[in-house]
Amino acid sequence: MTSKVANTEVAQPYAQALLSIAKSKSLTEEFGTDARTLLNLLAENQQLRNFIDNPFIAAENKKALIKQILSEASPYLRNFLLLLVDKRRIFFLEEILQQYLALLRQLNQTVLAEVTSAVALTEDQQQAVKEKVLALTKARQVELATKVDSDLIGGVIIKVGSQVIDSSIRGQLRRLSLRLSNS
């Protein structure tokens, strides 16, 4: 199995090439939407991921599947993925798409805020988190990636880059426990 660093090194030039294509055709947001959809599809469908990652499956079979899945997508994106199959780089598809989205966020001055909460956040709560992150980062936009972790008991943990804001009840209990053990 290859390391995350090696995957990133292989994926970065392809992600930059994809962004270059998207910018030249004014399709950066459309590619971003398609990349998110494809990443969600790969995350939800282990069979699809196994099919794409399997080196013993013929390239023509992979190409046929890509053409079928991306029939509604931009032909530029579809051809890019077909090129990845030809170059035997389709194994790095997820990392390439994640790198593309990171480059797109950078281009749009958007930050990714990973929000973990005890229960699913309402639209109002998500908007409040976005406003808080905007105030902290001075970015133009915020993209939220939310997940639920019932172990938090209540509250949220917000991660933006290397900065973590822990306002969860679990975090507060941990800090209280540390203070009590130090006194």
UniProtKB/Swiss-Prot annotation:
One of its GO terms (molecular function) is proton-transporting ATP synthase activity, rotational mechanism. GO terms for cellular component: plasma membrane-derived thylakoid membrane; proton-transporting ATP synthase complex. It is a peripheral membrane protein. Keywords: ATP synthesis, CF(1), Hydrogen ion transport, Ion transport, Membrane, Thylakoid, Transport. It comes from the Bacteria. It is found in: Cellular thylakoid membrane. Pfam families: OSCP. PROSITE patterns: ATPASE_DELTA (PS00389). F-type ATPases have 2 components, F(1) - the catalytic core - and F(0) - the membrane proton channel. F(1) has five subunits: alpha(3), beta(3), gamma(1), delta(1), epsilon(1). CF(0) has four main subunits: a(1), b(1), b'(1) and c(10-14). The alpha and beta chains form an alternating ring which encloses part of the gamma chain. F(1) is attached to F(0) by a central stalk formed by the gamma and epsilon chains, while a peripheral stalk is formed by the delta, b and b' chains. NCBIfam families: ATP_synt_delta (TIGR01145), PRK05758.2-2 (NF004402). HAMAP family: ATP_synth_delta_bact. F(1)F(0) ATP synthase produces ATP from ADP in the presence of a proton or sodium gradient. F-type ATPases consist of two structural domains, F(1) containing the extramembraneous catalytic core and F(0) containing the membrane proton channel, linked together by a central stalk and a peripheral stalk. During catalysis, ATP synthesis in the catalytic domain of F(1) is coupled via a rotary mechanism of the central stalk subunits to proton translocation. This protein is part of the stalk that links CF(0) to CF(1). It either transmits conformational changes from CF(0) to CF(1) or is implicated in proton conduction. Belongs to the ATPase delta chain family. This is ATP synthase subunit delta. The gene is atpH.
